[in-house]
C-alpha cells in the first residue's frame, strides 16, 4: 500500500503511521497489527533537548531496532506509566520510538522510510485524537521559567511542534510541586491560546511568520513542518538532500488553492525566486 501511495515523489493517498506503540504490551508494533482508528490513538508531542542533554537508549520496546534519543533525566518506563494513566487509549505514537532513528542496525532503511513517514507526522496530530504534550522535553517534569520561553529548545520555539498544536492537549510531566509562578502561567496560557487560534483560522503568511522565530536542526525541516498545516495534496516526500528553497518551490505547487491565492494577493512584493507570483523562501523567512 505504501509503494502504491508514492507517485513521482508525491504521496497521493492517506497513509497511516508505519508503527504504533502498543501500551498494553509495551511494544512497538506495525500499524496494521494494531488496526486502530486514528482518533483512538494517543499522540505524544515534545521538543527534542540538545545533544549534550540527551542519551541514546537501546530498549526492547522497539526490539532494539535503533537507539531511542532521550533526555538524560527521563525514563521510558516512567513515560509508559504516565501515558497509560493519561487516557484509556491502548495505542500511542511517539516519534523517538515509532519513527526509525539514526544509527540503528538497519540504517539503510531509514532514508527511504523518512521520505514517506516524516511528511505524515502532521497527520498523527491532525485527526482529533487526544495528545500528551511534554513542554520541557520528553518525560521531563513541567518546570518552566520565563527564560525557558526564549530557549531554542522550548516547545514553543521548535519548527516541528508548530504542526502539533492540539486544542485539548493533556499536559505531561505534571507533579504536585509543579505550580507555575503566576507570570509564567500567564505566558504559558497566552502562547497556547495564540497558537490554537492560529490553527483555527489558518493563514499561510501567519504560519510563515511564526516559523521565522522557530528553530530546527536542519533548515529543510522548517519547510517540512508546514506541509500538513497548508493542506497539501498530493503531499511531497521528505528529501533530506533537498534545499529549503527547492522544497518551498515544490510545496507552493501543492498547497491548498486558498493559500496560493493568499501568497499571490497579499504578499506585498513580487517573488525574487523562480516565480514572481509568490515569495521565495528567503522572502518569507
Give the ranges of each region predicted by the language model.
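Short helix/strand-capping turn motifs
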Residues: 193-285
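Conserved aromatic-histidine-acidic binding/catalytic patches
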Residues: 67, 71, 106-109, 113, ...
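Glycogenin-like
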Residues: 55, 124-187, 207-208
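Generic structural signal for hydrophobic core residues of well-folded globular domains
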Residues: 47-48, 86, 165-169, 227-233
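Short, well-structured alpha-helical interface segments that form or flank functional binding sites
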Residues: 116, 120, 157, 218-221
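Metal-dependent phosphate/diphosphate-handling catalytic cores characterized by acidic Asp/Glu clusters
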Residues: 1-92, 98-117, 123, 127, ...
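Conserved, well-structured core segments
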Residues: 42-45, 132-133, 158-164, 224-230
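A general structural signal for short secondary-structure junctions and capping/turn motifs
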Residues: 32-36, 122-126, 151-154, 163-166, ...
Amino acid at each position: 500500500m505504501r509503494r502504491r501511495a508514492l507517485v513521482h515523489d508525491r504521496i497521493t493517498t492517506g497513509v497511516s503511521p508505519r508503527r504504533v506503540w502498543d501500551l498494553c504490551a509495551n511494544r512497538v508494533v506495525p500499524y496494521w497489527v494494531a488496526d486502530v482508528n486514528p482518533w483512538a490513538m494517543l499522540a505524544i508531542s515534545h521538543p527534542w533537548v540538545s545533544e549534550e542533554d540527551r542519551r541514546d537508549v537501546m530498549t526492547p520496546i522497539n526490539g532494539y531496532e535503533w537507539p531511542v534519543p532521550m533526555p538524560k533525566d527521563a525514563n521510558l518506563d516512567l513515560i509508559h506509566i504516565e501515558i497509560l494513566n493519561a487516557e484509556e487509549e491502548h495505542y500511542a505514537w511517539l516519534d523517538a520510538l515509532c519513527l526509525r532513528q539514526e544509527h540503528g542496525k538497519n540504517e539503510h532503511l531509514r532514508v527511504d522510510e523518512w521520505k514517506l513517514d516524516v511528511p505524515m507526522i502532521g497527520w498523527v496530530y491532525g485527526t482529533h485524537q487526544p495528545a500528551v504534550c511534554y513542554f520541557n522535553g520528553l518525560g521531563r517534569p513541567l518546570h518552566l521559567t520565563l527564560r525557558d520561553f526564549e530557549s531554542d529548545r522550548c516547545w514553543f520555539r521548535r519548527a516541528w511542534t508548530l504542526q502539533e498544536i492540539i486544542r485539548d492537549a493533556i499536559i505531561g510531566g505534571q507533579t504536585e510541586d509543579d505550580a507555575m509562578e503566576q507570570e509564567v502561567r500567564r505566558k504559558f496560557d497566552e502562547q497556547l491560546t495564540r497558537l490554537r487560534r492560529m490553527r483555527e483560522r489558518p493563514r499561510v503568511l501567519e504560519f510563515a511568520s511564526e516559523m521565522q522565530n522557530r528553530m530546527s536542526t536542519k533548515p529543510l525541516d522548517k519547510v517540512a513542518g508546514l506541509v500538513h498545516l497548508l493542506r497539501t495534496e498530493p503531499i511531497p516526500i521528505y528529501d533530506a538532500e533537498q534545499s529549503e528553497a527547492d522544497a518551498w518551490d515544490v510545496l507552493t505547487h501543492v498547497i491548498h488553492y486558498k493559500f496560493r491565492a493568499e501568497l499571490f494577493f497579499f504578499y506585498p512584493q513580487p517573488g525574487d525566486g523562480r516565480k514572481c507570483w509568490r515569495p521565495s523562501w528567503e522572502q518569507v523567512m
